[in-house]
């Protein structure tokens, strides 16, 4: 009937900020942020892995340092053999090997730091990688950086876990790219921007990566942003997650502050047309 019930077991770990299920559905990985925002500021941030048992309970498998304290998000590359982690407060990203048979996490194989800033002196004084994910069809990986208004593009060596930069995609100043989703059947990606309330539609070239083809404002045109409490009353937008329906027919953008979800119809070329708001 869709109701939820606890399994009865509670696993305690310091400040788990992100949960990601492996594509084989056998393991769950958590990243742990150690910062003043979580109240646990000492030590080194890490990732932990758990085996998902038949009754839904979790059995801890391993922990591994990510090389930084500010872990924000994590995903798996298309092979399922590498964990891609953002280090929001350290301005970088990390790649860690993952064994899909045992659930064990290896030591960091790549950990580049980003450079630069954006026009917002509070939110963009330094780089802030927020999303890091792999292309579903190639070995390209992308890091959305809220602090620099760029999507950093890399080629992942799926033998060694090394990263080779292949360029950056610059978005509008002050946009604050937060995350990205891939269309399930089109070679199109959607970058949701937190600071200016937009989604950027990008075509994907298998070698060159992203090319922006459309930008849509997701808040009502007459909405005056009142600002999130952490924005010090400066009146920004505070866009949150963006996602696609399972069939790729619709794109959804969460409009924080306005407390709504913007719904867009996805066209045959991947471009968006506003449909409704809920």
Map each language-model feature to its residues:
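Short loop/turn segments immediately following beta-strands, especially the blade-tip
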Residues: 1-2, 50-56, 95-106, 154-162, ...
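Conserved beta-strand positions in repeat-built beta-propeller and related beta-rich domains
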Residues: 30-34, 39-41, 85-88, 135, ...
């Amino acid at each position: 009937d869709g109701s939820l019930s606890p399994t009865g077991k509670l696993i305690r770990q310091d400040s788990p900020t992100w949960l990601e299920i492996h594509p084989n559905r056998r393991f769950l990985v958590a990243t742990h942020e150690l910062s003043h925002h979580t109240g646990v500021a000492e030590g080194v941030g890490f990732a932990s892995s758990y085996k998902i048992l038949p009754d839904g309970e979790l059995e801890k498998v391993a922990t591994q340092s990510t090389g930084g304290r500010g872990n924000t998000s994590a995903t798996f590359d298309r092979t399922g053999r590498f964990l891609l982690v953002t280090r929001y407060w350290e301005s970088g990203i990390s790649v860690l090997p993952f064994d899909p048979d045992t659930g064990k996490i290896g030591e960091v194989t790549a950990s580049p730091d980003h450079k630069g800033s954006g026009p917002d002196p509070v939110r963009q004084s330094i780089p802030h990688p927020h999303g890091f994910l792999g292309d579903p069809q190639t070995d390209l990986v992308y890091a959305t950086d809220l602090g620099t208004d760029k999507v950093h593009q890399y080629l992942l060596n799926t033998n060694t876990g090394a990263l080779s930069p292949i360029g950056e995609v610059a978005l509008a100043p002050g946009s604050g790219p937060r995350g990205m989703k891939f269309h399930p059947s089109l070679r199109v990606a959607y970058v949701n921007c937190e600071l200016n309330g937009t989604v950027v539609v990008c075509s994907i070239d298998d070698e060159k990566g992203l090319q922006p083809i459309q930008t849509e404002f997701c808040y009502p045109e007459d909405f005056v942003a009142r600002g999130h409490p952490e924005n010090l009353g400066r009146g920004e937008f505070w866009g949150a997650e963006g996602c696609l329906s399972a069939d790729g027919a619709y794109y959804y953008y969460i409009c924080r502050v306005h407390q709504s979800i913007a719904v867009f119809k996805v066209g045959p070329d991947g471009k968006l047309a506003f449909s409704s708001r809920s």
